[in-house]
Curated annotation (Swiss-Prot):
Catalytically driven reaction(s): L-citrulline + L-aspartate + ATP = 2-(N(omega)-L-arginino)succinate + AMP + diphosphate + H(+)
Gene behind this protein: argG
Organism the protein comes from: Streptomyces clavuligerus
PROSITE patterns: ARGININOSUCCIN_SYN_1, ARGININOSUCCIN_SYN_2
GO cellular component: cytoplasm
InterPro entries: Arginosuc_syn_C, Arginosuc_syn_N, Arginosuc_synth, Arginosuc_synth_CS, Arginosuc_synth_type_1_subfam, AS_cat/multimer_dom_body, Rossmann-like_a/b/a_fold
GO biological process: argininosuccinate metabolic process; L-arginine biosynthetic process; urea cycle
UniProt-recorded Gene Ontology molecular function terms: argininosuccinate synthase activity; ATP binding
Pfam families: Arginosuc_syn_C (PF20979), Arginosuc_synth (PF00764)
Protein name: Argininosuccinate synthase
Subcellular localization(s) per the UniProt record: Cytoplasm
Residues annotated for L-citrulline binding in this entry: Y87, N123, R127, S175, E259, Y271
Positions that bind L-aspartate: T119, N123, D124
EC number annotated for this UniProt entry: 6.3.4.5
Amino acid sequence: MTERVVLAYSGGLDTSVAIGWIAEETGAEVIAVAVDVGQGGEDLDVIRKRALACGAVEAEVADAKDEFAEEYCLPAIKANARYMDRYPLVSALSRPAIVKHLVAAAKKHDASIVAHGCTGKGNDQVRFEAGIQALGPDLKCIAPVRDYAMTRDKAIAFCEAKQLPIATTKKSPYSIDQNVFGRAIETGFLEDIWNAPIEDIFEYTSNPAEPREADEVVISFASGVPVAIDGRPVTVLQAIQQLNERAGAQGIGRIDMVEDRLVGIKSREVYEAPGAIALITAHQELENVTVERELARFKRQVEQRWGELVYDGLWFSPLKRALDGFIEEANQQVTGDIRMTLHAGTAVVTGRRSERSLYDFDLATYDTGDTFDQSKAQGFIDIFALSAKIAAKRDLV
C-alpha cells in the first residue's frame, strides 16, 4: 500500500507547493487538512478544491472556530494566561487544536506521517510535533521547509513549473499568524528591536492615539466562563469576536515584546489581541472579588507554569492536564459582572458585582457601620511578627 501523509494545509503558496513536493520527495500520497480557527480569508470549500487541484488525493476542511474558542481559548481565559506576563498565547493555543484534527485524519486515512509547514527555527515545529507524538505516538513528522530545504524561491519555481492554481505574488515582508484570539506579526524591519512598529502592520486594532468616544462594556461570567456582554447572552466565540471589534476599535491589545523562544533565542514579536486582553482583564478582576486570598496567591503561580507549558507545546502533557483541574476548581466561584471603559488603548475596570463576592462592605468601610474589630489587631500583629522578632534578637547578640 502506498504510504500516506497528512499535511496541515493553509491554502497558501507554501503548503500548496508542499503537496507535490512531499509526493516527489517521499513517493507518498498527500491528504490535505485545513482547520479554520478564525484566521479569516478564503472560504473553506475554495481551499479544499485548491488542495485537490494541487495534487492531494483527498482534502478535508474543518470549521473549528467554536471548538477553538471553547476548548482552547476559554482555558486560557480562566488561567489569565500571559506568557512572560504579556503574551496571551495567541498562536500557541491554536496549534493543539489543529494537531487534534491532523491526528484524527491520519487515523481515519491510515496515514503514517503528518507534515507541517514550520521552519526549523521557531516554536511551532515543537508545538506541532510534540502534540502529534502525544496523540499519535506511532506517527512520524516531517516539515518540508525544514527537512527538504523548500525555500520560498524554490516554492515559487516549483509552483510555476507545475502550473499550480495559486498566485505567486511577492510575499509580505512580515510573517503573520492569526486566529480569532489574536494576531502575531514578526520578521521584516521588526527584527531590528529599535524600530517602532508602523500602523500598516496592524489589522485587528485601530490606532489608540486617534480621538474617539469611549466605549463602556459589561462582561458577565459564570464560573469563569464569559456568558453575556451588556446583558445579552453570548457563546465564548461570540464574546471574543464582539470584544475583538469593540476593544480593537479602541486600540486595545497591542503588545510589542522581546520574547524568550523555546528554541533558545530571543525574538521580537508584535501581537494584537483585543478580545483576549479585554476578557482576561475582566476575568482577573472578577477573581480578585470572588477568590479567597491563599487560593488566589497560589493560582498566580499555577497560571505562570500553565502558560509556559502551553507556550512550549506541552498542551497534552500530564502536568498541563493536572493544572487544568486546579484552574477549573479555582474558577467555581468566579461568577458576576465586570464593567470596563474601553478607550485610548486601555481597558479600565470601573465596576464589579457578584453574588459570590468575598468583599464585605461593612468590614471594609472606614465610615459609620464598620464591623471590623480593630481591638484584635495588636494581638494578631504580635503573633504574626513573632518569628521575625525572635530572629532579630538572636542576630543582635
